């Protein structure tokens, strides 16, 4: 009965979001601008756990292209605030922390912030409309695009190209919501990206684990291709200062141990669901204009963070200040607070320490292996 009541309450608050957030303003102001055009890309990945990225030490070549990008900034200690898309992505689009979850229904999100700061804003999604808080926050963007099947993420880059070729705006924010590594994994990439084989569509069972992992790793390899090509495109733009921030919404279980857990969104978490891939890239013109932000990002590569940092990092990348924004939560700020407590939003919408999310000794060993302290 408690869960039914909570679900009903969430539905009502989501339904009334337009009313409860109507008068909210960030009172946004820009403290600096770059000469020429400014383009900011905020890319939300799907189910991309860090353990299966070559950039994080994985022994398979799942990042053959990004591994060749010398000016990439890889954040190595980022945990998701929720192991479900419908909770994680709203937090990624919002300034709200898990400790103040009720504020989610009263504050607007990243598109509204950039609108106030004078940007042209786009939300381009490779997922279906959610009919929930993701839509409420995302639909403040001035332009919305939902991609139809086959829903390969490279189609997002096609849309980015069209926007930047056609738009006359000098200040643009593009938020991309990827399909990434959403199950079924073998459907997330064209067949020419089936590098690890066999990757057949099989029943979920321990005896099929290798095929499932092969397909999952192929999806990560395709994400690698998408991100690398996106960076190449941004790099090619003349007279443009650009910055890109990527992070997955949550991780994934792949029948990793004796628990034989698969997928995500379970009431209790695992290290595999919590530890996510996140990275940033800055164009040469951006680096010249904002060397202190780039230096801070590089200094914070190993800083402990959660997906709460993403909103504040993106705002700070664009030199936007205002209500509810914090430099102490921005990974491109020398003021970033490495000592801030990290909290997870549990099934009851309570902020709890990660150690109290049902983690077992095998999870703590995984975190130890990656140098992560909870």
Give residue ranges: language-model regions:
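Catalytic domains that recognize anionic headgroups
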Residues: 1-374
